[in-house]
Regions:
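N-terminal export signals
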Residues: 4-23
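Gly/Pro-biased beta-strand-loop elements
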Residues: 28-143
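Short, cationic motifs built from Arg/Lys/His that form the positively charged side of catalytic pockets
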Residues: 3-4, 164
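Generic beta-structure capping elements
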Residues: 91, 146-148, 188
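Short, conserved helix/loop micro-motifs enriched in His/Cys and acidic residues
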Residues: 143-154
Length: 190
């Protein structure tokens, strides 16, 4: 499967929903187009994988029968997004967070105060759940697919390289994805 196949599969997307869902969205403050939705994808894409298409801020959890659940995500800022093939090497609930040395170097005012780490909780930037991306031979890449304490950043390129979801969607994805699941982060083209 390549990026073109996945994008071609998304061309036929149809939002599924109801009036009740739309009313819930208004009450929760989440835009209707940011809700997870089951969508058709190209046949032949294996179930049980995560595919992130950065140009559209979409993450797909693939299902049997050429279907996927589509989530809206925030992605890495220009120059910090890393395309590639990974696997889920760890999963954590309410993960602790420590900025990398590179993050502290880029923005010491924002990150130096957390050099010793921050415990998990509602103020933590990793949110309610995190999937840790690993590469064979490299181990932990420090890339994550995680929740966020800043839901307004979904649909934008603002992170330090990770893909982020609103917390309830991060919990939903976390509960579906097993360890060792394949993750594909496609290259940015725009």
């Amino acid at each position: 499967m390549d990026r073109r196949q996945l994008i071609a599969g998304t061309a036929a997307l149809a939002l599924l929903g109801s009036r009740a869902v739309a009313q819930d969205v208004v009450a929760s403050g989440i835009r209707p187009d940011f809700l997870p939705v089951e969508v058709p994808i190209q046949p032949g894409i294996a179930p049980g994988e995560i595919h992130v298409v950065p140009d559209t801020f979409m993450l797909y959890w693939t299902l049997p029968g050429a279907r996927a659940i589509r989530y809206m995500v925030g992605i890495g800022r220009p120059g910090l997004y890393e395309a590639g093939e990974f696997y889920v090497g760890a999963k954590k609930e309410w993960p602790s967070w420590t900025p990398t040395p590179e993050m502290i170097e880029r923005d010491p005012e924002a990150y130096a105060q957390y050099a010793d780490g921050m415990p998990g909780g509602p103020d933590n930037p990793l949110g309610a759940r995190a999937l840790y991306l690993f590469e064979p031979g490299r181990g932990d890449t420090f890339l994550r697919i995680h929740g966020t304490n800043a839901p307004g950043t979904i649909g934008t390129a603002v992170s330090n390289g990770c893909a982020r979801l609103v917390n309830d969607q991060a919990v939903d994805l976390y509960n579906r994805v097993p360890l060792q699941a394949r993750v594909v982060l496609y290259p940015q083209t725009v």
